[in-house]
């Protein structure tokens, strides 16, 4: 997809294919209204007011294809800042595809993935962070993830980055003035102090922003959570309890879960990617052995480990092995089967364990509370009006910007002339511009929009 502005008219189906109450076919471009008008029988769309919905029929050769409502929105007050038409049809694969093909035959071009959002970016309606927020909003798995995406779409990150870039420019301009038109005998010292003060200010701001990355990444991608334990301690039953549906096979036969099962669940706004692992033990079964190896790998990569022990049986060597290999992880130890007489030796266990009964659904809510304590310091997940980093691209660029600012600091410590340090500060300004798209390479922008679905 070319990064250059294109002014032809594009079209695509904007609703999921399949049976449904309605389908929407969208057009955007200079000829959007004229093309829609060619196939619409009703009011003259070229003369109706902007932002109106018009009843009529889509026809070809006087044959009615569907009864529709057509929305007409004139530039620049549209998502793309171009003329936009949305044809609201009855849902279904055949009718939406037929109308799409008719619009293409009438002069529109099939849109590429993300091209509507790309045009909104190229026409200056949104920046790159807001474009990425559109995708985050589509993919949000919980209300908290949605809140963060909406905040970014509303411009919270864009405004913070743009304000910081402007402050950097102001600092660079003041340095230039001080160097070219010195008003004081100690102008070099004054300029050095200015650069030092501003550099520390920018560092503090970006470090605070970077500190939100852990929380933001969890909201965007989910908290990878491995459920581990020896066979038949209730791992799959716990998974089903958290999911509140039967997703894993639960039996009384040891070794039933022979692979790794992954599911997402919303725990108080946190999207947990639950990984139910095969019981980790020595086995001669080839299939089960593969599952055990995958379980060990899942344990290494997990953000959180839920270690399930059977409180109705004494600790086994397998239990002790699991306690040992998971001790450096963010771990919650769960004593399951508290509905049965206790036989486990609790003196060998850490004090912060949680007794539960998956069978009777007892103390499951305490797992949720402990997760909040472990990852969010009981402070709540999303603070009102806060800006969060959740995108790996943004995080990487903020880290690079901080490296450039640190280079300025090191130069100051070494007594380097301030005019030489302008290079690193200018580099910081450029890196931050890559976040918003002001200085992003064409190839990057093209690649980002190609990840969108058709019609968005």
UniProtKB/Swiss-Prot annotation:
Its EC number is 3.6.-.-. PANTHER family: TRNA MODIFICATION GTPASE GTPBP3, TRNA MODIFICATION GTPASE GTPBP3, MITOCHONDRIAL. The gene is mnmE. GO terms for biological process: tRNA methylation; tRNA wobble uridine modification. Transmembrane segments: none annotated. (6S)-5-formyl-5,6,7,8-tetrahydrofolate binds at residues 26, 86, 125, 456. This is tRNA modification GTPase MnmE. The keyword Ligase does not apply. GTP binds at residues 232-237, 251-257, 276-279. Residues 222-376 form the TrmE-type G domain. Homodimer. Heterotetramer of two MnmE and two MnmG subunits. Mg(2+) binds at residues 236, 257. PROSITE patterns: G_TRME. Binds 1 potassium ion per subunit. It comes from Streptococcus thermophilus (strain ATCC BAA-250 / LMG 18311). It holds the Pfam family TrmE_N. Exhibits a very high intrinsic GTPase hydrolysis rate. Involved in the addition of a carboxymethylaminomethyl (cmnm) group at the wobble position (U34) of certain tRNAs, forming tRNA-cmnm(5)s(2)U34. GO terms for molecular function: GTP binding; GTPase activity; metal ion binding. GO terms for cellular component: cytosol. Belongs to the TRAFAC class TrmE-Era-EngA-EngB-Septin-like GTPase superfamily. TrmE GTPase family.
